[in-house]
């Protein structure tokens, strides 16, 4: 089925006399006739619902739609994109393990990997996404368990060479996790290029209206955990909390990853998306394919204007022919990338601050990738926890402005930027 149709009708097919819109199952718990019936759920011997901290029918309908959009075999929703990335990584890694990650990633994810997970005994090596195959290979250690990157990095807007990173990961017997938030599956499906697991902050384009927080994890079902059983004891050895069940044996490579993340991590951490948020997310998904076209068109128009302006020192947008990532964008993002543009002004950080203050249509806010135009100085906000060396590696200089082009008229957006630049 075409992805446009999946956006509208995927995930839920009503029966005769059932609601056309997905139902909101706003209930914490679910009734069963016997203790034996419920016991089968707790032993993972039967499908069903018993507590919405782990699973909920509304959430599963929306997760199924996202799974269909990405071309995966199983999926789950989380309370945020940050929760999705943590679950995806921690579902594989434990104390003593190592992660290889692209250096140009969202500041919150960088902090998660480099600081928070370090406290759990998990270390990481960050690599330039444009590194050679030899440099990438050198980043691996005997205890490396996963490779991570973003299809389009926030806010540096670098493009991940998914095939290169997948090849390196698989050569070392580990999976590649790709955060596909910015392009969404409308513009890129990482599984088609070798990725094994995809994550999303559904708060961004998928919701598209700045209304609800959420995240998603999708499994391709292609990574053979049992073929590398010694690397992944959490998936390939008995889980004492479920009477010795071995996820990779019981659920196979198509279902082991999401089953473990749900039954174990969601049970213990409880970062579940609410049914109401899932319902509102689905409303956003129904128009995702249409909105992404406009976001991409506005992003390109703004990027071209900025590139030609004498007060602009540089522009990061992979759709521009001048971008060092243009060839990768043509390969992985032939239908467009996203509506986010980042740029630096010749006058440095002070000029950037003045420009943002003078904008009328672009509000200064931490959000990105939704219907309204907005902007941000990442070095003083989303990446504020980084030192100068880390900022440089992440592609986030002090003067960088991240602009998220909304669904407004591109002519109005450009006119607003022009008048702001005139004030510098």
Named regions from a protein language model:
Residues 1, 114, 123-124, 138, ...:
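PLP-dependent enzyme catalytic core of the Aspartate aminotransferase-like
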Residues 1-56, 64, 404:
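N-terminal "arm"/small-domain region of PLP-dependent enzymes with the aminotransferase-like
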Residues 7-13, 75-308:
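Conserved PLP-enzyme active-site core in the AAT-like
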Residues 14-16, 206, 270, 331-333, ...:
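Short Gly/Pro-enriched turn/cap motifs at secondary-structure boundaries
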Residues 29, 220-223, 345-348:
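Short loop segments at secondary-structure junctions
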Residues 34-86, 108-116:
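Conserved N-terminal alpha-helix of the aminotransferase class I/II PLP-enzyme fold
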Residues 47, 73, 213, 277-281, ...:
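Short amphipathic alpha-helical segments
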Residues 292, 300, 304-307, 311-401, ...:
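Conserved C-terminal alpha-helix-loop-beta "cap" of PLP-dependent enzymes
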């Amino acid at each position: 089925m075409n992805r446009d149709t999946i956006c509208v009708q995927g995930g839920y097919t009503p029966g005769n006399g059932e609601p056309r819109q997905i139902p909101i199952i706003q209930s914490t718990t679910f009734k069963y006739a016997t203790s034996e019936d419920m016991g089968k759920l707790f032993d993972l011997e039967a499908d069903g619902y018993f507590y919405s901290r782990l699973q909920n029918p509304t959430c599963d309908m929306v997760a199924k739609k996202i799974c269909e959009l990405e071309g995966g075999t199983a999926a789950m929703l989380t309370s945020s994109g940050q929760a999705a990335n943590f679950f995806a990584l921690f579902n594989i890694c434990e104390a003593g393990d190592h992660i290889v990650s692209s250096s140009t990633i969202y500041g919150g994810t960088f902090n998660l990997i480099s600081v928070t997970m370090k406290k759990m005994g998990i270390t990481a090596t960050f690599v330039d996404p444009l590194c050679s195959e030899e440099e990438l290979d050198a980043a691996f250690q005997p205890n490396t368990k996963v490779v991570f990157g973003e299809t389009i990095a926030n806010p540096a807007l670098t493009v991940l060479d998914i095939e290169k990173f997948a090849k390196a990961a698989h050569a070392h017997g580990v999976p590649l996790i790709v955060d596909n938030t910015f392009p969404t599956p409308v513009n890129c499906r990482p599984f088609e290029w070798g990725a094994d697991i995809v994550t999303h902050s559904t708060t961004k384009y998928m919701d598209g209206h700045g209304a609800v927080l959420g995240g998603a994890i999708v499994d391709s079902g292609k990574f053979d955990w049992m073929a590398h059983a010694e690397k992944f004891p959490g998936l390939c050895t008995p889980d004492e909390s479920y009477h010795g069940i071995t996820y990779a044996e019981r659920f196979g490579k198509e279902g082991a990853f999401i089953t473990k993340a749900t039954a174990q991590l969601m049970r213990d951490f409880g970062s579940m998306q609410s049914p109401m948020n899932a319902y509102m997310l689905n409303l956003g998904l129904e128009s995702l394919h249409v909105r992404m076209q406009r976001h991409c068109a506005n992003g390109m128009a703004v990027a071209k204007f900025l590139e030609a302006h004498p007060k602009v020192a540089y522009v990061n947008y992979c759709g521009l022919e001048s971008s060092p990532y243009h060839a990768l964008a043509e390969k992985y993002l032939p239908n467009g990338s996203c509506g986010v543009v980042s740029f630096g002004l010749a006058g440095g950080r002070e000029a950037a601050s003045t420009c943002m203050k003078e904008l009328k249509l672009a509000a200064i806010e931490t959000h990105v990738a939704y219907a309204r135009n907005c902007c941000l100085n990442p070095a003083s906000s989303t990446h504020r926890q980084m030192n100068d060396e880390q900022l440089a590696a992440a592609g986030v200089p002090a003067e960088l402005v991240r602009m998220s082009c909304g669904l407004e008229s591109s002519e109005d957006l450009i006119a607003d930027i022009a008048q702001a630049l005139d004030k510098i």
